[in-house]
């Protein structure tokens, strides 16, 4: 099964072709990503209109390149998958409309993919992984602990009550005048800092639920930075290191609660899986490895290039759904908001409904 995947939900324009084998394994034939960092850097963050225009300018070129690198033509494709949300609506429209046009011209099934579901299923592209597993999804817009029970079967165990993890990293970077994109800059500065200099709060520690809260931690960083003004380079490094240390402690506690709740409801997970752009953070990856080792379960984190937004994850999610007979009509709508667990409710615009519930 050959599937073209298109990703345009934020500030990466991406296209990829994957092959799904009969045994359920996958192979990436091409995976082209074009970042928009240069376009958004002058503004210190993603500007939705600029992002949408960049997608329009680049997507056709990237699709053509992905097809050429994969060595296939459109007639060979079994499906066209596009991220239909959640995300910046202008970009989502660009990608989904392009996918619809290709699917219509070549009479190929369309799969409108939930971007979060694509992150959730990516580990199955990289390693043989059976359901169920516990997912820690951390990105610029989402921080969740999810029970992944099957394709289209998701139960949210914990979520952030305020800022997403990636959002908190970006906001801390901005208040410290670090370049865009902020998350990697905070991680880089933290390597040179003292994580014990500032005793920042560890929100939600010890609670029985698995929810996250990061706004108080972010405020504590802002207050300390304001007190120290003007900031020296070592101050910035120490603030970043202390912030990241607090985040790691919070993540560890929240995930341990999530694993306990997972076991109570669904039994022992096959693995603890991390996905989303924040999962590319080395310190966070190492902390997750320690949690999994303590809990005596397998830890799976996709390669960094598959943690951040990319077309291969969209193509793979499309292939997983296509294998169950799940396709969409041309009326599939772009969505700015689309909860992952809402994917368990098969939309009426699916052609058939063989997903397991």
From Swiss-Prot:
GO biological process: tRNA threonylcarbamoyladenosine modification
GO MF entries: iron ion binding; N(6)-L-threonylcarbamoyladenine synthase activity
Reaction catalysed by this enzyme: L-threonylcarbamoyladenylate + adenosine(37) in tRNA = N(6)-L-threonylcarbamoyladenosine(37) in tRNA + AMP + H(+)
Main location per the UniProt record: cytoplasm
SUPFAM superfamilies: Actin-like ATPase domain
Species per Swiss-Prot/TrEMBL record: Afipia carboxidovorans (strain ATCC 49405 / DSM 1227 / KCTC 32145 / OM5)
Cited NCBIfam families: gcp_kae1, T6A_TsaD_YgjD
PANTHER family: TRNA N6-ADENOSINE THREONYLCARBAMOYLTRANSFERASE (PTHR11735), TRNA N6-ADENOSINE THREONYLCARBAMOYLTRANSFERASE, MITOCHONDRIAL (PTHR11735:SF6)
Keywords for the protein's UniProt record, in alphabetical order: Acyltransferase, Cytoplasm, Iron, Metal-binding, Transferase, tRNA processing
Record note on cofactor: Binds 1 Fe(2+) ion per subunit.
GO cellular component: cytoplasm
InterPro entries linked: ATPase_NBD, Gcp-like_dom, KAE1/TsaD, Peptidase_M22_CS, TsaD
Gene that this polypeptide is encoded by: tsaD
Described purpose of this protein according to its UniProt entry: Required for the formation of a threonylcarbamoyl group on adenosine at position 37 (t(6)A37) in tRNAs that read codons beginning with adenine. Is involved in the transfer of the threonylcarbamoyl moiety of threonylcarbamoyl-AMP (TC-AMP) to the N6 group of A37, together with TsaE and TsaB. TsaD likely plays a direct catalytic role in this reaction.
Keyword Magnesium applies: no
Protein name (Swiss-Prot/TrEMBL): tRNA N6-adenosine threonylcarbamoyltransferase
């Amino acid at each position: 099964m050959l599937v073209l995947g298109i990703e345009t939900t934020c500030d990466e324009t991406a296209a990829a072709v994957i092959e799904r084998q009969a045994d359920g394994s996958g192979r990436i034939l091409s995976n082209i990503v074009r970042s928009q960092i240069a376009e958004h850097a002058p503004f210190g963050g993603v500007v939705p209109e600029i992002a949408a225009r960049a997608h329009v300018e680049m997507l056709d070129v990237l699709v053509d390149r992905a097809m050429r690198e994969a060595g296939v033509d459109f007639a060979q494709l079994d499906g066209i998958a596009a991220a239909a949300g959640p995300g910046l609506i202008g970009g989502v429209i660009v990608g989904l409309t392009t996918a619809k046009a290709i699917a219509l011209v070549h009479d190929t099934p369309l799969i409108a993919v939930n971007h979060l579901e694509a992150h959730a299923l990516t580990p199955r592209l990289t390693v043989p992984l059976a359901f169920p597993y516990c997912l820690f999804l951390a990105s610029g817009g989402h921080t969740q602990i999810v029970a992944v029970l099957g394709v289209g079967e998701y139960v949210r165990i914990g979520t952030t009550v305020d800022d997403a993890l990636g959002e908190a990293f970006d906001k801390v970077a901005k208040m410290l005048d670090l370049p865009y994109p902020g998350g990697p800059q905070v991680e880089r500065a933290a390597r040179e800092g003292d994580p014990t200099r500032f005793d920042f709060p560890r929100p939600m520690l010890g609670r029985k639920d698995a929810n996250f809260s990061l706004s108080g931690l972010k405020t504590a960083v802002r207050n300390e930075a304001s007190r120290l003004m003007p900031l020296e380079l070592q101050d910035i490094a120490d603030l970043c290191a202390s912030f990241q240390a607090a985040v790691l402690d919070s993540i560890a506690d929240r995930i341990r609660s999530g694993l306990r709740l997972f076991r109570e409801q669904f039994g022992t997970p096959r693995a603890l899986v991390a996905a989303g752009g924040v999962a590319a953070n080395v310190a966070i990856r190492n902390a997750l490895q320690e949690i999994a080792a303590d809990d005596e379960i397998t830890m799976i984190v996709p390669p960094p290039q598959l943690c951040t937004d990319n077309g291969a994850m969209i193509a793979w999610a499309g292939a997983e759904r296509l294998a169950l007979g799940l396709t969409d009509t041309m009326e599939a709508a772009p969505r700015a908001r689309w909860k992952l667990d809402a994917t368990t409710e098969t939309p009426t615009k699916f052609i058939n409904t063989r997903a397991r519930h």
